[in-house]
From Swiss-Prot:
Name used for this protein in its record: Thiosulfate sulfurtransferase GlpE
Functional note: Transferase that catalyzes the transfer of sulfur from thiosulfate to thiophilic acceptors such as cyanide or dithiols. May function in a CysM-independent thiosulfate assimilation pathway by catalyzing the conversion of thiosulfate to sulfite, which can then be used for L-cysteine biosynthesis.
Enzyme Commission number: 2.8.1.1
Gene that encodes it: glpE
Any single GO BP term: glycerol metabolic process
Length: 107
């Protein structure tokens, strides 16, 4: 895949639930926002943690990228595609959409 795909918050949650997929959600919001609340088991992706992500997550694993509203995540998703990740999604609506949909959040 040369491009990332878009995914709704509900479909993102379903993909994360499918354990056989071993999908990973990365949250690119600022540290304070991440601490206040994030999707369960989300990986906080920053310039300082990108190497850790690439060491821990196989290129074949689905990666879902979340930001605040679903805009910044698109650039990050394309970056991950360019690094070799084969199945990358930008979560439409971002964390705000996830929260408004009443989906689970942890602190």
């Amino acid at each position: 895949m040369d491009q990332f795909q878009h995914i709704s918050v509900v479909d993102a949650q379903e993909k994360l639930k499918q354990q056989d997929l071993n999908a990973v959600l990365v949250d690119i919001r600022d540290p304070q926002s991440f601490i206040r609340g994030h999707v369960e088991n989300a990986f906080h992706l920053t310039n300082d943690t990108i190497v850790e992500l690439m060491n821990e997550v196989d290129f074949e694993q689905p990666v879902l990228v979340m930001c605040y509203h679903g805009h910044s995540s698109q650039g990050a998703a394309q970056y991950l595609v360019n690094q070799g990740y084969e199945e990358v999604y930008s979560v439409d609506g971002g964390f705000e959409g996830w929260h408004k949909a009443g989906l689970p959040v942890e602190k």
